[in-house]
């Protein structure tokens, strides 16, 4: 550890002299440059600017226009963008964003867990202090398969690579856009008001400031039947970016963001789908009718089980063109804080049993420092080498759990009363990496890259009941790598084949006190991919891939309900031998002058190892993994038609089809959701110069109640968590630019 600390100090000292810059060249190249020809969609999947058709990685790209058309306002909405990507929005479970790619992800309530799908914003890894809200975004790239060589620890399944709009020194501009809906109006099952704004101010001929912000106010999707009030779920955020082209060779980029949010009565949390006959009668008495799509709960206490969130972060980025090399330095810091009042987890005052949590809070602080040196893109041997350091500290306050049971004679007993524990988790790592591409011929390229990671994960735990302490350490020392071939069949068709060994750090699981913490081993996938990319219709990109991956020590969470106390108990564990294999095809870009489209289909056979016994003691070996649909289809498209001089009409569609989804490591049918379509769309008009637009939109037209989470034996019944994706929304969209 001493060597690691000395190396960290050396990196920090060197940063004083580092010459580097914006979020790479993408920050200084106007957005129009990436859109002047659809065949030249520019991505940064290999930490340099490249055409998407030249990158030997399966990628789904969503432009700003598509994100706004599909109303992608937060990470959870990214479900609709790529068939390979799933985002689970269950509260406190969406580690590092909660994403899974090709069936592989990390769903965990443990504060010591890290993600399998990394979230990277303007080159900065978000760790577990990730952003939630998406606004003023230029594009999003979904990179599939292990990306650890260039992106680091939390990318064993893939990366969500987000690029926001850069400041523009050439002009003053601004924009305001809104999405407005009201519960009960035009069939909308909840209300939501989204307001986003941006202003771009040139400071000089070589620098500019861009400030953007948003407010996302939602009423529902849950309703307190006792008071008749819909839950308020509100979020606010602002981002500032300052870009300065100091010289022709040196660029400085300073970024900062702040966000704040609150939820009432648990926000989007469990409601009852079914229960025993006796309990159903009790639930009916306070206004709850258990069933699919139930939005009601009943709490008499004001604002019980509510939470608040606040987070901020910033980065300083320098880029210097030193002739044969481009040198980059990125220094970043993030901080997130959440607090929860605690309350009745069942959210049903009428039940004889109550599972109650106490007030608690969590703080996450993340510091990262990265240095890179990159060769010119037109060299025979292109390469990127660098070093990366991260230090993430999580402090989780004790959370009391109590179970109370009201007996028929009126006496209340408390079979469980745990005061919880204070958990302090430090995750520190240092890595060196490099990846190169050798142009063996004009058509053939050879890829080779590797990353060495050394780190230390530690947990200090103090039992709130008796003050006893425990300490756990997990040291890591691993190499991940990537190799492959890439061949240009002709000017518009490229093929590739790669092999990658990924790596995701271990966990120190923190079960409910007085149970002691334990180590969950690092996750190591061995993955193979072959694919082709083609340019069609003069500009659209076709991306086809075949993939296979076997994961050693897949990190999973197994949740069961204690039949005596009815307490939900979740344990983190390793499952060795999980496999995912299949095929995917994506088509995105502009099909014609009037039609743009992003569509894709994936077949993913992601399975438990043979003989694996699930939480219900049944053999589910070879069955589909939890949270992973075997088939998924996505379609987003817009057709534009001139109506009058200066005015165009548009019609957009947004459709998803998923096969049956399993939500727990069991064979219970009640913990799955059927195959289903989710259909949405938009119709409206916009000015020919796109300065103004107005439209009507609908999401989940047929009101299909796909849950975020299903849990059997919840309060002697079945519980579901529903989010905004689970109900119909109808509203008005307005947009103005100046």
Stretches found by the model and what they are:
Residues 1-70, 76-80, 200, 248-249, ...:
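N-terminal Sec signal peptide and the immediately downstream disordered periplasmic leader
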Residues 196, 315-344, 488, 492-502, ...:
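Membrane-embedded beta-barrel scaffold of Gram-negative outer-membrane proteins
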Residues 262-273, 393-395, 456, 486-529, ...:
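Surface-exposed extracellular loop regions of Gram-negative outer-membrane beta-barrel proteins
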Residues 383-384, 442, 446, 548-550, ...:
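Gram-negative outer-membrane beta-barrel transporters
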């Amino acid at each position: 550890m001493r060597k690691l600390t000395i190396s960290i100090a050396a990196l920090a000292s060197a940063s004083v002299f580092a010459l580097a810059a914006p979020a790479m060249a993408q920050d200084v190249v106007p957005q129009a440059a990436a859109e002047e020809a659809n065949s030249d969609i520019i991505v940064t999947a290999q930490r340099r600017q490249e055409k998407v058709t030249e990158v030997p990685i399966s990628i789904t790209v969503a432009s700003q226009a598509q994100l706004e058309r599909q109303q992608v306002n937060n990470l959870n909405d990214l479900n609709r963008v790529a068939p390979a990507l799933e985002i689970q929005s269950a509260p406190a479970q969406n580690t590092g964003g909660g994403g899974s790619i090709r069936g592989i992800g990390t769903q965990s309530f443990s504060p010591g867990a890290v993600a399998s799908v990394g979230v990277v914003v303007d080159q900065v890894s978000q760790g577990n202090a990730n952003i939630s809200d998406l606004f003023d975004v230029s594009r999003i790239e979904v990179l599939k398969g292990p990306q650890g060589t260039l992106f680091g620890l939390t990318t064993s399944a893939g990366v969500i690579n987000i690029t926001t709009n850069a400041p523009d020194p050439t002009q003053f501009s601004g924009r305001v856009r809104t999405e407005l809906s009201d519960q009960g109006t035009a069939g909308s099952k909840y209300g939501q008001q989204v307001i986003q704004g941006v202003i771009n101010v040139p400071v000089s001929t070589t620098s500019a400031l861009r400030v953007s912000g948003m407010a996302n106010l939602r009423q529902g999707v849950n309703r307190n039947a006792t008071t008749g009030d819909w839950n308020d779920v509100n979020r606010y955020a602002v981002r500032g970016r300052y870009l300065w082209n100091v010289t022709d060779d040196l660029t400085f980029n300073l970024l900062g963001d702040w966000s704040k949010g609150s939820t009432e009565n648990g926000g989007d949390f469990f409601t009852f789908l079914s229960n025993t006959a006796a309990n159903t009668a009790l639930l009916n008495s306070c206004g709850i009718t258990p069933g699919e799509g139930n939005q009601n709960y009943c709490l008499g206490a004001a604002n019980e089980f509510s939470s608040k969130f606040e987070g901020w972060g910033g980065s300083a980025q320098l880029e210097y063109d030193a002739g044969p090399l481009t040198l980059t330095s990125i220094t970043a810091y993030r901080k997130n804080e959440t607090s929860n009042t605690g309350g009745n987890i069942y959210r049903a005052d009428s039940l004889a049993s109550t599972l109650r949590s106490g007030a608690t809070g969590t703080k996450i602080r993340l510091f990262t420092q990265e240095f890179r040196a990159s060769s010119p893109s037109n060299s025979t041997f292109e390469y990127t080498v660098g070093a990366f350091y991260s230090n993430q500290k999580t402090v989780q306050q004790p959370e009391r759990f109590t179970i109370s049971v009201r007996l028929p004679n009126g006496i209340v007993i408390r079979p469980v009363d745990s005061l919880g524990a204070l958990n302090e988790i430090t995750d520190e790592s240092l890595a060196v990496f490099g990846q190169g591409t050798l142009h063996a011929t004009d058509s053939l390229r050879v890829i080779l890259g590797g990353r060495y990671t050394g780190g230390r994960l530690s947990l200090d735990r103090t039992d709130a009941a008796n003050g006893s302490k425990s300490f756990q350490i997990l040291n890591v020392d691993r190499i991940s790598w990537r190799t492959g071939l890439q061949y240009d069949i002709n000017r518009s068709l490229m093929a590739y084949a790669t092999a990658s060994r990924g790596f995701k750090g271990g966990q120190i699981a923190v079960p409910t006190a007085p149970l002691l913490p334990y180590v969950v081993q690092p996750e190591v996938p061995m993955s193979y991919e072959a694919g082709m990319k083609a340019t069609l219709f003069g500009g659209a990109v076709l991306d086809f891939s075949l993939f296979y991956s076997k994961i050693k020590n897949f990190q999973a969470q197994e949740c069961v309900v204690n039949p005596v106390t009815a307490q939900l108990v979740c344990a983190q564990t390793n499952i060795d031998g999980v496999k995912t294999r299949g095929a995917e095809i994506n088509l995105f870009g502009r099909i014609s002058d009037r039609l743009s489209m992003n569509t894709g289909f994936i077949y993913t056979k992601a399975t438990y190892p043979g003989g694996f016994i699930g939480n219900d003691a049944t053999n589910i070996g070879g069955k589909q993994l939890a949270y992973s649909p075997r088939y998924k289809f996505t379609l987003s498209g817009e057709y534009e038609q001139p109506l009058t001089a200066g005015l165009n009409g548009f019609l957009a569609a947004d459709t998803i089809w998923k096969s049956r989804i399993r939500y727990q490591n069991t064979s219970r049918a009640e913990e799955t959701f059927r195959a289903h379509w989710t259909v949405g769309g938009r119709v409206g008009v916009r000015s020919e110069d796109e300065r103004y637009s107005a439209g009507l939109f609908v999401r989940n037209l047929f009101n299909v109640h796909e849950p975020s989470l299903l849990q059997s034996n919840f309060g002697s019944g079945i519980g579901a968590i529903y989010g905004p994706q689970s109900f119909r929304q109808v509203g008005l969209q307005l947009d103005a630019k100046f």
